[in-house]
Amino acid sequence: MSYKFRAIYTKPSNEVSLHTPPAGLYDLVDTMFNEGKITQKPIRTTDGLNETFEIVFANEAAYNEWKGSAVVHENKTTRSEHCNANSISYSIEGPI
């Protein structure tokens, strides 16, 4: 069973940007995609001030590997600090 997760951000204005993920996050996505552990790389959709990213993992084990990664934890901290400092609300949904 695949695991789909969605991150939804709502910015206070168009002048505010989302955080910049650590470079290692892109490497992890590529590696896990090439290994078949990610079946859909993150897809970004924008609707006004709302931005959504959706990623699909092959199974629960692949997702657990992802969330246990040091670079994912680094990204989580960076995202939280940036969103709090810039009044960006966000939620993580999944599995959906």
What residue ranges belong to the model's regions?
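Short S/T/G/P-rich N-terminal loop/turn motif that feeds into the first structured element of a domain
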Residues: 1-52, 56-70, 88-96
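Conserved short beta-strand edge segments in small beta-sheet-based binding/regulatory domains
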Residues: 75-93
